[in-house]
Amino acid sequence: MSNLKDIKRKIKSVQNTQKTTKAMKLVSTAKLKKAEEAARHSRVYALKINEVLSEIAYKINQFKIVGKDDKFFDLKASINKVDIIFVTADKGLCGGFNISTIKTIRNMIEEYKSKKIKVRLRAVGKKGIEFFNFQGVEILESYKGISSAPTYDKAKGVIASAISDFVAGATDKVILVHNGYKNMISQEIRINTIVPVETPSIENVEHSSSLMEIEPENDEKILEELMKKYFEYSMYYALIDSLAAEHSARMQAMDNATNNAKARVKELQLAYNKARQESITTELIEIISGVESMK
């Protein structure tokens, strides 16, 4: 009987877990729809800013334009220090979502170290911060509570110090890494070099839908405002895109957990029925044996 009680207790425990994971899946599904829509709209705007900025970068390099912002487009400058801003979740239970980003960062660190290039980390998200702190890896700046509730103002705060360091010469390159939303069931690592801005090929510029002519006297002012928006929105989009990917990963993880719990309940139910049958058989044998002994 004690065995039957143990199995019954396990069944109830797994069923409770199943209810929890199912509820978490439903919550993640609802949040995903909202985050997915925000990421889709943000991506259109981010891509357009990148397109226009790349054209300006191309013209600066083509016509050898020199100004206070030309440092942002100098791809020939030597790279001795690299700042990597990476985004992970503040929470777990989302499968390999955080691990994928962490593995990418570790590989990048090793690659740059092999080239004698110093790497500085700026971490957004509790899970990434905890991992690298545990590993004893120095983190220049840490931000918690942002990846789970991103806003444009928060994004500005994260990217501002990295760009200031780049302008001051404290770093030679700023890279943004996050696990982005691909579709409902998959995510992909996205690595974006924020500065220096990469220059497109002549063919890409000539076929660009945003090709424009800018008056020389307005170049500096337009470029300054555009650069500011580019930095801020690149960071904001990474946060929004990462959040959508996090929800899709958690939805999938909770769906798998629910299915596993369902299968486990079925196994335990079979074990319970078998144990109960054996218990009844044993009791019948004991009764029959008792009757026989009385004859």
Curated annotation (Swiss-Prot):
This is ATP synthase gamma chain. Gene3D superfamilies: 3.40.1380.10, ATP synthase, gamma subunit, helix hairpin domain (1.10.287.80). F-type ATPases have 2 components, CF(1) - the catalytic core - and CF(0) - the membrane proton channel. CF(1) has five subunits: alpha(3), beta(3), gamma(1), delta(1), epsilon(1). CF(0) has three main subunits: a, b and c. The gene is atpG. PANTHER family: ATP SYNTHASE GAMMA CHAIN, ATP SYNTHASE SUBUNIT GAMMA, MITOCHONDRIAL. Signal peptide: none annotated. Pfam families: ATP-synt. It comes from Campylobacter fetus subsp. fetus (strain 82-40). It comes from the Bacteria. InterPro entries: ATP_synth_F1_ATPase_gsu, ATP_synth_F1_gsu. CDD domains: F1-ATPase_gamma (cd12151). One of its GO terms (molecular function) is ATP binding.
